[in-house]
Amino acid sequence: MVRVAAAAAVLVLAAAAAAAAAMAAEPPTDDGAVRVAAGLTKCVSGCGSKVTSCLLGCYGGGGGAAAAATAMPFCVIGCTSDVLSCATGCSTSL
C-alpha cells in the first residue's frame, strides 16, 4: 500500500514536471530566440518542494501502526490534490 502511494505521488510529480517543461518555453520571437519562462519553472519547483514536505509528513506521521495504515492513503491523496492545485495555479498565474 505504501509503495503504491509513493509510486502514485512520483507519477503526479512527473506529470507536473512534464507539464511545466512543455509550457516553460515560449514560442520563438522575431529574432528566432526561444526564451524560457523562469517564473513558471520556479513556481513548479516550489510545488515540488511542498509536495515533498507533505509526503514526508505522511510517512513520518507518528501514531500507532493501525492508525498510520488507515491515515496514510488519505494523507497521500491530500498531497496529490495539493500539488495538482499548485501546478495548475502556476500555469494560470503567469
Curated annotation (Swiss-Prot):
Superkingdom of the source species: Eukaryota
Record keywords, A-Z: Developmental protein, Signal
Transcription regulation listed as a keyword: no
Signal sequence, renumbered to the chain: 1-24
BP terms from Gene Ontology: anther wall tapetum development; anther wall tapetum formation; pollen development
Further facts: Plants expressing an RTS antisense construct display interruption of tapetal development, resulting in deformed non-viable pollen.
Stated role: Required for tapetum and pollen development.
Name of protein: Anther-specific protein RTS
